[in-house]
């Protein structure tokens, strides 16, 4: 179970890094927001879901 938590945290860190780099690039590029809006919202939704799943799995271990 500890390995599952570690993998979830690794995925959370990786997705956070992608969003921290990707969102400002999309917002700074002219015209990219309209093309990438759905992708950014999907990434934010995945990040939120991953935080919730990680917290639920962590609560089962403790």
Swiss-Prot record:
Membrane-spanning parts: 8-28, 41-61
Membrane topology: Multi-pass membrane protein
Keywords, comma-separated and alphabetical: Chloroplast, Membrane, Photosynthesis, Photosystem II, Plastid, Reaction center, Thylakoid, Transmembrane, Transmembrane helix
Principal subcellular localisation of the protein: plastid
Biological function: May control the interaction of photosystem II (PSII) cores with the light-harvesting antenna, regulates electron flow through the 2 photosystem reaction centers. PSII is a light-driven water plastoquinone oxidoreductase, using light energy to abstract electrons from H(2)O, generating a proton gradient subsequently used for ATP formation.
HAMAP family the UniProt entry points to: PSII_PsbZ (MF_00644)
Membership in a protein family: Belongs to the PsbZ family.
Subunit and interaction comment: PSII is composed of 1 copy each of membrane proteins PsbA, PsbB, PsbC, PsbD, PsbE, PsbF, PsbH, PsbI, PsbJ, PsbK, PsbL, PsbM, PsbT, PsbX, PsbY, PsbZ, Psb30/Ycf12, at least 3 peripheral proteins of the oxygen-evolving complex and a large number of cofactors. It forms dimeric complexes.
Protein name listed in UniProt: Photosystem II reaction center protein Z
Organism this protein belongs to: Pyropia yezoensis
Designated gene of the protein: psbZ
């Amino acid at each position: 179970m500890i390995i599952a938590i570690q993998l979830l945290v690794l995925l959370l860190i990786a997705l956070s890094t992608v969003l921290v780099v990707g969102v400002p690039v999309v917002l700074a590029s002219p015209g990219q927001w309209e093309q990438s809006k759905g992708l950014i919202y999907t990434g934010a939704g995945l990040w939120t879901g991953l935080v919730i799943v990680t917290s639920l799995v962590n609560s089962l271990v403790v």
